[in-house]
Amino acid sequence: MNSIISHRGTYDSENTSLESIKNCVEKDIGIEIDLRLNKDTVYVSHDPCEPSLFFEDICSYLTNTNVQIALHIKELDAIAPSLKTLKKKNVSNFFLFTIENHKIQQKEDFQIAYYANIMPHDVSDQIIWCDESIKKWFNTETISELKNKNNQLIAISQEISTNCLLDVAQSYWKFL
């Protein structure tokens, strides 16, 4: 099964906003959200900055939805308060991932995706976040091998990481 996850939760906009998150949920489009911590508050941003969009506000739109929610933990200290907010807001259809796979400690009942920028081996996580922004590593064999292990693969689409025409992106989608 293929599905779409919106990069940084944007939909018909350039930046993540409450409106873009709401639009994704209404259109049944999954959401990838970058989370950071400022003091005790989790905020949404790809890069460190002064917080203007807070995770707790976004969670109001994520309650009772079936869209897949990918939480990209940019700072490991954001994990515990993020989980607390998710529990408080009753958000359940999510998974966490970080480029520092080994540093997420599974203490509660939540899913972790394995971040891979090369072909992963001996991965026990069910979800694999496949990133080719640094190096191309997908091919028919690697995709088949990972799928045969019952992994859910999430790939970053070409147009996110490079300038490309729509037909190039669509060709990539078919390949996946």
Region roles according to the model:
Residues 1-176:
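Phosphate-group recognition and catalysis centered on beta-loop-alpha active-site segments
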